[in-house]
């Protein structure tokens, strides 16, 4: 989708806030660790290349979801280690070796397929994924982990790391977290050939369970200034949201009582009302379930009335404003703010999704 550069809708990314968030989290981890910044899904909507370039001297490497995301960073000149957290099938190995991209290997079946294809894994760096209770990808016992490490090394691979992912590190009840941690710790401690890097700490673990980190951490949503738990757990220190979403009024009119607004006529004016139109809609990631939410105009919360359309939304204004008046959808305006977590709570989802769904049609600018 092409970016719409000639309209006032814009996501502003504060790169210095991301740097400060990394510094804040790492300073609260009680031992020396390697830090990988997670920039998958276009850095959670913030711009993977721009973020990676800005923080490259602060971190030891980057994590992405798939091979194409890794290649984007390499093609942009990023030289630090890049680990793909998802599974790349063996036919992607030659390209990973060529571009010095580390792969996650999550099963003996992957190894068997590589052997059947006659692959030489010399030059490949990989990390073993352990399923300690998430139920997605990864080996589930010590024997499989040992066999996988030995088999990969026999084909020439450098098994640099082993890791797991916690399902509930961002919840108040830590019983499942403790079970996963115990499982993974026991497995790692009993490996025949333990890899150099051991990591289990995502953002939530690094914040609320910092004492449990191994020798590497993966920092994701927290570096973008979002609370990984939404509003479930209080953050023990301050972080700064790095993205604000802004637009401007493109149409303002006064409607008499009894006038319908938007598709389906789901909103009807009850009195004389000033209605403003904004150039953003569900094609931009501002989804239909945000009807009834609000934006900020001139330091005042203004409700979204009528359905969210593909390209436009309508809001009720306290008075007539001139065209071009700035409007904030996420961020601060006149001492009033809207957070991604508040947007997520209105939508019944998580703040991660709010930012990841901001489409390419919304240009990003960088400070």
Curated annotation (Swiss-Prot):
PROSITE patterns xref list: ALANINE_RACEMASE (PS00395)
* Reactions catalysed, as given in the entry: L-alanine = D-alanine
Under the heading InterPro entries, the entry gives:
Ala_racemase, Ala_racemase/Decarboxylase_C, Ala_racemase_C, Ala_racemase_N, Ala_racemase_pyridoxalP-BS, PLP-binding_barrel
Claim: Repressor is one of the keywords in the record: no
Task: Name the enzyme group at the top EC level.
Answer: isomerase
> Signal sequence: where?
none
Tell me which family the UniProt entry assigns to this protein.
Belongs to the alanine racemase family.
Q: Which HAMAP family match?
A: Ala_racemase (MF_01201)
Any idea what this protein is called? Answer: Alanine racemase
């Amino acid at each position: 989708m092409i970016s719409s550069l000639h309209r006032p809708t814009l996501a502003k990314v504060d790169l210095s806030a991301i740097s400060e968030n990394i510094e804040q989290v790492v300073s609260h981890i009680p031992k020396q660790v390697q830090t990988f910044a997670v920039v998958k899904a276009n850095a959670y909507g913030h711009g993977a290349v721009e973020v990676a370039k800005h923080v490259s001297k602060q971190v030891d490497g980057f994590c992405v979801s798939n091979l194409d995301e890794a290649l984007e960073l390499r093609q942009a000149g990023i030289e630090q280690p890049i680990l793909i957290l998802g599974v790349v099938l063996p036919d992607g190995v030659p390209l990973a070796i060529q571009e010095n991209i580390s792969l996650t290997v999550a099963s003996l079946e992957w190894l068997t397929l590589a052997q059947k294809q006659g692959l030489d894994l010399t030059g490949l760096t990989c990390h073993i994924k352990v399923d300690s209770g998430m139920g997605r990808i990864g080996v589930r016992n010590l024997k499989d982990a040992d066999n996988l490490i030995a088999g990969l090394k026999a084909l020439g691979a450098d098994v640099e790391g082993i890791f797991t992912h916690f399902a509930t590190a961002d919840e108040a009840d830590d019983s499942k977290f403790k079970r996963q941690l115990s499982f993974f710790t026991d497995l790692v401690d009993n490996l025949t050939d333990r890899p150099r890097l051991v990591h289990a700490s995502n953002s939530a673990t690094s914040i609320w369970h910092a004492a449990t980190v191994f020798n590497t951490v993966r920092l994701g949503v927290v570096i973008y200034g979002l609370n990984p738990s939404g509003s479930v757990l209080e953050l023990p220190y301050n972080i700064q949201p790095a993205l604000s979403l802004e637009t401007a009024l493109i149409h303002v009119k006064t409607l008499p009582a009894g006038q319908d607004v938007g598709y389906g006529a789901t909103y009807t004016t009850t009195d004389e009302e000033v209605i403003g139109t904004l150039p953003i809609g569900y094609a931009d990631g501002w989804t239909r379930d945000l009807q009834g939410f609000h934006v900020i105009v001139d330091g005042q919360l203004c409700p979204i009335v009528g359905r969210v359309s593909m390209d436009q939304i309508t809001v009720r204004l306290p008075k007539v404003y001139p065209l071009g008046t700035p409007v904030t959808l996420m961020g601060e305006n006149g001492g009033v703010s809207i957070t991604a977590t508040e947007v997520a709570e209105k939508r019944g989802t998580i703040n991660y999704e709010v930012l990841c769904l901001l489409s390419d049609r919304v240009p990003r600018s960088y400070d």
